[in-house]
Structure formats: structure tokens, C-alpha cells
């Protein structure tokens, strides 16, 4: 495995991009992939969020979650993705991270019934440490910006407000 991951540490950003696109994202490789969220090259950082993690975050029907599915990541890894992605200096990287975080809402979706958006957002928030984390607010705001459909579908009634 070390030989397979070695190109991710090469000086050439082209080599790192090619390695990211061809490396299998597994529980053993995800931590190395996440180190590229702090790459010096903006294109590599954008690729991590917009291609590698996004592709492996979606859950095919009746399949086990991939290594980049929000439930497969640790809380620390999810928080790292949010912090580094939404805090990046480049707007293109922030946009790619926002798209990934928006996709997480669908990835952890609990149902398809009418009005399930609130429950889906609760499931999304449940993937974070709500007591200790400061990035949850950023993640939720990002969902509201990138997923206008989610924001527009939110309805608060007395049952939600009384609990």
C-alpha cells in the first residue's frame, strides 16, 4: 500500500492529481486522501472535494457505504473536511466543499416522504459532535446556500418548535 500512496507526496501537482483520480478510496487510504485538502495546489484541493470525496460519498442502492460516505468517516474527519473546505482561500475549493456537504444531506437521508427534509437535516446534524464542534454551524449554512431546495422545503410547525 505505501507504494500505491507514494505519488500523493510527489512534488508535481499533475502527479498528485493523477494519483487522486486513480487511487481506490478505502478505509486505509482515506486519511491520506484527506491530507490533500491542504495541498499547495488549488486544483488538487478542489479535486479532493469535488471529485474524489463526492464520488465516494454517494450511496448506491442496497450497497455498503464507501469510505467517504459521511457515516463511514469519523467525526474528526467530517469536521476536517468542513473546516478545511469551507475555510479555504479559493472560492472554487469552497464551492466544491459546499457541494460535497450538500450531498451529505442526501447520503444520510432517512426517508422520501413529504416533509422529510427536517428529519434529513437532523440526520445530517447527527453526524457531527453538536456539543463540542464549532464547524456544525458552517456546515448547516453551507447546506442552506448550496441546497436551496432543502432550505425552501423547510417548514417549522408547532411540533418542531415545542421540542
Q: Where does each model-flagged region fall?
A:
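Short coil/turn segments at helix-helix junctions and helix-capping linkers
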Residues: 3-17, 32-47, 81-95, 127-131
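Alpha-solenoid helical repeat scaffolds
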Residues: 1-28, 51, 67-71
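Long internal repeat-built scaffold domains in very large eukaryotic proteins
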Residues: 62-163
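N-terminal alpha-helical segment
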Residues: 29-30, 78
Amino acid at each position: 500500500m505505501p507504494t500505491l500512496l507514494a505519488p500523493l507526496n510527489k512534488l508535481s501537482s499533475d502527479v498528485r492529481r493523477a494519483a487522486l483520480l486513480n487511487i481506490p478510496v478505502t478505509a486505509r487510504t482515506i486519511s491520506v486522501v484527506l491530507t490533500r485538502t491542504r495541498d499547495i495546489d488549488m486544483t488538487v484541493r478542489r479535486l479532493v472535494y469535488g471529485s474524489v470525496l463526492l464520488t465516494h460519498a454517494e450511496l448506491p442502492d442496497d450497497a455498503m457505504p464507501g469510505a467517504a460516505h459521511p457515516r463511514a468517516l469519523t467525526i474528526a474527519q467530517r469536521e476536517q473536511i468542513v473546516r478545511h473546505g469551507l475555510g479555504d482561500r479559493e472560492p472554487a475549493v469552497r464551492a466544491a466543499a459546499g457541494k460535497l456537504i450538500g450531498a451529505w444531506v442526501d447520503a444520510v437521508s432517512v426517508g422520501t416522504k413529504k416533509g422529510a427534509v427536517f428529519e434529513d437535516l437532523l440526520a445530517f446534524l447527527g453526524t457531527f459532535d453538536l456539543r463540542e464542534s464549532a464547524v456544525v454551524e458552517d456546515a448547516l449554512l453551507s447546506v442552506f446556500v448550496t441546497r436551496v431546495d432543502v432550505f425552501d422545503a423547510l417548514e417549522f410547525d408547532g411540533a418542531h418548535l415545542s421540542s
